[in-house]
Amino acid sequence: MPLHNVVVTGIGPVGAFGLGADALSSALQTNQPLAQPATKNQGLGLATDLACEIPADSFKIRDVVPKSHRKAIKVMCPDIESALAATDSAIRHANLRTTTTHPEETPIPDPLRLGCQLGAGLIAADIEELGGAMTVAAPEGVVDVQLWGREGMERLTPLWMLKYLPNMPACHVTIVHGAQGPSNTMTCGETGSMLAITEAARVVERGDADACLAGGTEDRIHPVQRLRQHLSERLGEGVPFQDTGATPAQGGAVLIVESLE
């Protein structure tokens, strides 16, 4: 069976520069400084308090989610919201149509031929949500497994886990846009997004889909994520042209990978 030629027809980046290809291009052309003092959880004693945060006015999650799916917003962490915003931007950039971007028109491509491959990191839970449960389970500063199972877990909401499973960004994206083709989530750290794009290209190349939503998303400015990077000595003041230091960021990007035919 002949292989299909694969092309990228749209991009949807989201990050400290804002949302969309134009926002990214503008930031690059104007040398816009993106690393700023973190707006939350300062004074943690980390190697750096700088962070690249998505501006609050970049997008509203209600604008990229149809009314039929808005009840699910309450179980969306920043990683999921970034994935949905990036996907919406990429679809519009590629002039495709889905049941969400163009609800009154016929989707292009066929939903059965639209796949989704996304990279995702280890999503950290909100400290506010875990705080009460941990306080009960660790009255003397050490977690008591028996207390955690008997009393701590009762303080978590029933839908708590649905906010933090790494496959949830792809789950929400495929539901919102009706993508019923091959779907997968790559949880391989920094390589996850590249692996997702590579798999998407292979899916289209062999003819299992006409197009795929491919990329990744992660929130590395979460205090737990920042602390994890600090303890592993991966966090530090980022200095241009030096190979030491790293500045945490949140964001992601989705590409539209299509068959040229």
Which stretches of residues belong to each language-model region?
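Short pre-catalytic strand/loop immediately N-terminal to key active-site residues, enriched for Gly-Thr
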Residues: 157-161, 181-188, 242-244
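Active-site-proximal alpha-helical scaffold in enzymes
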Residues: 83-95, 166-179, 183-215, 248-261
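Acidic, glycine-rich active-site loops and adjacent beta-strand->loop/helix elements
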Residues: 12-14, 120-123, 188-192, 216-221
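Glycine-/small-residue-rich "gating" segment that lines the acyl/pantetheine channel
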Residues: 138-154, 198, 202, 217-261
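Extreme N-terminal starter segment of soluble prokaryotic enzymes
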Residues: 2-9
